[in-house]
Amino acid sequence: MQIVGILLLYDANFFLLYPRGIIVNGLLAVGIGGFIGAILRYGISEWMNTDTFPYGTLAINIFGSIMMGLLMMLLSREYISHEVGLLFCTGMIGSFTTMSAFSFETMNMWNQSQLQGILYAMVNMIICPIGAFLGWKIGTFMM
């Protein structure tokens, strides 16, 4: 394969070389998916979050975990292409769900009520991995 491009990441001492086309397809897939996921996240958060509880973020994290499990199962069995995986998993689900929002909201809830902060964190850390597992099982059942 002919190496046609160099991507500079982080600093001048770190270079990654990519074969022709891989970086363009991957970047476009992640970018388009990221745009869609970010828009969905914003809309759902605005619609569902309240002043007392971030219902939107919780719903996003649970649904995103289920979808990630389903999509990763499909990707692992090659029912979807690598580029489709980048579009949906890395791009859309990656920007749709976010650890930073979860962390910030947990901290805010902890400051209001330690019990509520602990419960919110525990629900996310227990339900979301279960959601990923369920998504995987749903995908297995569908195939």
What are the residue ranges of the model-derived segments?
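Membrane-interface helix-loop junctions in multi-pass transporters/channels
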Residues: 2-143
